[in-house]
């Protein structure tokens, strides 16, 4: 398995993953042929996946210390993203993973029991070795989400545009009360598709209104989800 990351790579993750102009979502199956740097996109441990069969395990409780605020939202072209110079923390596998950024996909990239959701958020964390842990949270269409309402009062319309929130928002308020999760080993879902990522998919489904979902979809102008990838013998724990 390709263990990808140096800390320098992670610190520049927001641009390394989303700003390259030589890939898009029209033919994601060809990503591995576009650039030698993207060869991992044809790997055996790729994300996203369909979580269908799982193995029961005594997974450790997720311990978040998100004591940071959301100040700026940036349009990256392929997503909308919030970066953190000094993020909160996730304790996992006896290590500390620092929150670097979160971004959105619509529709969802990962499926749960074959079901797609209209919105998925990825919280990207890194440890001191530059290894990544991504916490994913799904949104179903339903009632208006108060946190998204405060964040999306004015979304950045153009690629590269940043919007500064008039009132910074606490990122910990985005987390659900129930932190039960699925776990598997995977990759980045965009080029360079680097593997060795610890994926944690929260089971509790959040809600967002049809208008909130539509606002993000219209902003992107296209679906920004990679198709599900083969498990290739990987096990999903819960």
Language-model features: locations:
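Generic cytosolic/nucleocytoplasmic N-terminal low-complexity/intrinsically disordered segments
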Residues: 1-2, 225
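Sec-dependent signal peptide recognition
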Residues: 2-10
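N-terminal signal peptide c-region/cleavage motif recognized by signal peptidases
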Residues: 14-16
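Alpha-carbonic anhydrase
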Residues: 18-238
């Amino acid at each position: 398995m390709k263990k990808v990351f140096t800390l320098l790579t992670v610190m520049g993750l927001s641009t390394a993953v989303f700003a390259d102009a030589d890939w898009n979502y029209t033919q994601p199956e060809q990503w591995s042929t576009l650039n030698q740097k993207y060869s991992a996109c044809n790997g055996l441990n790729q994300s996203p996946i369909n979580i269908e069969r799982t193995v029961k395990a005594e997974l450790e409780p997720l311990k978040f210390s998100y004591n940071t605020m959301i100040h700026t939202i940036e349009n990256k072209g392929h997503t909308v993203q919030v970066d953190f110079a000094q993020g909160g923390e996730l304790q996992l596998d006896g290590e500390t993973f620092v929150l670097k950024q979160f971004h959105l996909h619509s529709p969802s990239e990962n499926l749960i029991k074959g079901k797609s959701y209209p919105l998925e958020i990825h919280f990207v964390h890194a440890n001191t070795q530059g290894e990544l842990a991504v916490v994913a949270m799904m949104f179903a269409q339903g009632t208006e989400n108060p946190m998204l309402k405060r964040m999306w009062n004015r979304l950045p319309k153009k690629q590269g545009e940043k919007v500064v929130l008039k009132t910074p928002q606490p990122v910990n308020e985005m987390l659900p009360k129930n932190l039960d999760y699925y776990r598997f080993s995977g990759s980045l879902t965009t080029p360079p598709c680097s593997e060795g990522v610890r994926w944690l998919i929260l089971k509790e489904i959040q809600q967002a209104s049809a208008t909130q979902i539509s606002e993000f979809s219209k902003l992107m102008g296209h679906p920004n989800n990679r198709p599900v990838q083969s498990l290739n013998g990987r096990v999903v724990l819960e």
